[in-house]
Curated annotation (Swiss-Prot):
The keyword Lipid biosynthesis applies. It comes from Brucella canis (strain ATCC 23365 / NCTC 10854 / RM-666). This is Acetyl-coenzyme A carboxylase carboxyl transferase subunit beta. PROSITE patterns: COA_CT_NTER (PS50980). It is found in: Cytoplasm. Component of the acetyl coenzyme A carboxylase (ACC) complex. Biotin carboxylase (BC) catalyzes the carboxylation of biotin on its carrier protein (BCCP) and then the CO(2) group is transferred by the transcarboxylase to acetyl-CoA to form malonyl-CoA. It catalyses: N(6)-carboxybiotinyl-L-lysyl-[protein] + acetyl-CoA = N(6)-biotinyl-L-lysyl-[protein] + malonyl-CoA. GO terms for cellular component: acetate CoA-transferase complex. Coiled coil: none annotated.
Length: 301
């Protein structure tokens, strides 16, 4: 054994050896298969630069991109019974909740943020699909109501970002009870004369579309979002017919009058700020992009 064996060879092996790389450095575009560097994706608000595909986004990132300078404060999540039905499927519901809380750092699927957009104070309520598919249970329902109550208290508009698979089956009727409760909260906000804008993101399905997600003064959808009560596969199996191309997509729903506009995530802040300033009779920002004029066909329609 000599110094080449003892020193040089290990050095060469360490330099040329296989290094462990984080698994999430590159993210695959579901629409094209293109690999995108994670920092490029994050700097573009998790919108694929080449294809415009909108990736799912966590609640805290959504709030950071939405509010001025990324500054906001969150409301403490309301405390609710964790597992009143003692439900169990493949594992105990209480254990499933603990697992999601550990993975996401969230108490439940809803985060309420207070901040400003273009200087206008608002309340933003964000549903996070990464927490049990954004499902609506007691915790999420209470947090939504908390957001509406805070908006009424502070006399601020409320912007809600919906992203959910529907009611949380592990909570049974206690989950379904959140549909009328959140609907009442919407009515309270409207009675207070405060604007309510809903942003429908991918996916927005199930019971949320039968309650607060479709009760806004204005409905904006992100491009390519799946929006509907039941999924297209379930509908096809039920009616035994092939659905139209793009059925339940944002663009399809706008063409058929179910949403008011489809707006890229990159333009959401400016668009919502302009709408809220009009609705609250404040001077609009001249730097914000102006709405497109309707073409001849839409005028005729």
């Amino acid at each position: 054994m000599n110094w080449i064996t003892n020193y040089v060879r290990p050095k060469i092996n360490s330099m040329l050896g296989r290094r462990e790389m984080p698994e999430n450095l590159w993210i695959k575009d579901p629409s094209t298969g293109e690999m995108v560097f994670h920092k490029d994706l994050e700097s573009n608000q998790f919108v694929i630069p080449s294809s415009g595909h909108h990736m799912r986004i966590k609640a805290k990132d959504r709030l950071r991109f939405f509010f001025d300078n990324g500054e906001y404060t969150t409301l403490e999540a309301p405390k609710v019974p964790l597992d009143p039905l003692k439900f169990r499927d493949e594992k105990k519901y209480i254990d499933r909740l603990k697992d999601y809380r550990s993975r996401t750092g969230m108490d439940d699927a809803i985060v309420n943020g207070l901040g400003t957009i273009e200087g206008l104070p608002i309340v933003a309520t964000v549903q996070d699909f990464s927490f049990m598919g954004g499902s609506l249970g007691m915790g999420a329902g209470e947090a939504i109501i908390q957001g509406f109550e805070k908006a009424i208290e502070l006399k601020r508009p409320l912007v809600l970002f919906a992203s959910s698979g529907g009611a949380r089956m592990q909570e049974g009727i206690l989950s379904l009870m959140q549909l009328p409760r959140t609907t009442v909260a919407v009515e309270m906000l409207k009675e207070a004369g405060l604007p309510y804008i809903v942003v429908l993101t991918n996916p927005t399905t199930g019971g949320v579309t039968a309650s607060y997600a479709m009760l806004g003064d204005i409905h904006i959808a992100e491009p390519g979002a799946l929006i509907g009560f039941a999924g297209p596969r379930v509908i096809e199996q039920t009616i035994r017919e092939k659905l139209p191309e793009g059925f339940q997509s944002s663009e399809y729903l706008m063409e058929h009058g179910m949403v008011d506009m489809v707006v890229s995530r990159l333009e959401l802040k400016a668009t919502i700020a302009r709408l809220l300033k009009i609705m609250t009779k404040q001077p609009a920002n001249s730097d914000a992009p102006a709405p497109q004029k309707p073409d001849a066909d839409s005028k005729a329609a």
